[in-house]
Amino acid sequence: MNGPADGEVDYKKKYRNLKRKLKFLIYEHECFQEELRKAQRKLLKVSRDKSFLLDRLLQYENVDEDSSDSDATASSDNSETEGTPKLSDTPAPKRKRSPPMGGAPSPSSLSLPPSSGFPLQTSGAPSPYLSSLASPPYPPFPSDYLALQLPEPSPLRPKLEKRPRLPRKLKMAVGPPDCPVGGPLAFPARGSGASVGAALTPLPPPKMPPHTILSTVPQQMFSDAGSGDDALDGDDDLVIDIPE
């Protein structure tokens, strides 16, 4: 009976040992990961510093090359300016031409064989193409036109003068008078006797002529009896009321 019990105990111990080892391995793995992250950060920082230093070095090299090129051009200009008067002071020696020997043929006397493709033209008759190039089709510019010079623009633009602003005149609105039509006219009072005659009586309205009877009414309508010549002789009883 002790056999199976001992076996179970051994399995439990092995399980505990393995679990302890696994935890330790996980802890070591995390430590290594942290160290790896630190190393990567340092590497990134070093690479940035390297790129920055390379850029600065390239700028200094470009500046040195520009300065060396400018020095070389300045030295070449100085050498040219110094060498020109020396060359002008020393006259060039003249070479004496030897007379041609009678036995040696001159190059002008040698005649080239004519080519079979395109015959050469003689020097006496110029080609029409060359003559057209020699004489331009347009007339030359007149001397007066060439003598004219355009006015040079002034470097400073003329300043525009500001006109003084004139004071604006206020327009007063003219409206109808405030005094009532036909009412008493009131004036501001001044002095001790201001109340006397302060209000003036209104003017009496103008007299209108009396209404007149229309003059277009015929005279026959006003007569009580009609004349004998009228066409309406039988209408003697006709009465017309005229308002007075």
From Swiss-Prot:
Residues 10-54 form a coiled coil. GO terms for biological process: chromatin remodeling; DNA recombination; DNA repair; positive regulation of DNA-templated transcription; regulation of cell cycle; regulation of chromosome organization; regulation of DNA replication; regulation of DNA strand elongation. It comes from the Eukaryota. Residues 99-135 have a biased composition (Low complexity). One of its GO terms (cellular component) is nucleoplasm. Disulfide bonds: none annotated. There is a cross-link at K159, K171 (Glycyl lysine isopeptide (Lys-Gly) (interchain with G-Cter in SUMO2)). Signal peptide: none annotated. It is found in: Nucleus. Keywords: Coiled coil, DNA damage, DNA recombination, DNA repair, Isopeptide bond, Nucleus, Transcription, Transcription regulation, Ubl conjugation. Its main location: nucleus. Residues 59-179 are annotated as: Disordered. It holds the Pfam family INO80E. Putative regulatory component of the chromatin remodeling INO80 complex which is involved in transcriptional regulation, DNA replication and probably DNA repair. Component of the chromatin remodeling INO80 complex; specifically part of a complex module associated with the N-terminus of INO80. This is INO80 complex subunit E. It comes from Rattus norvegicus (Rat). The gene is Ino80e.
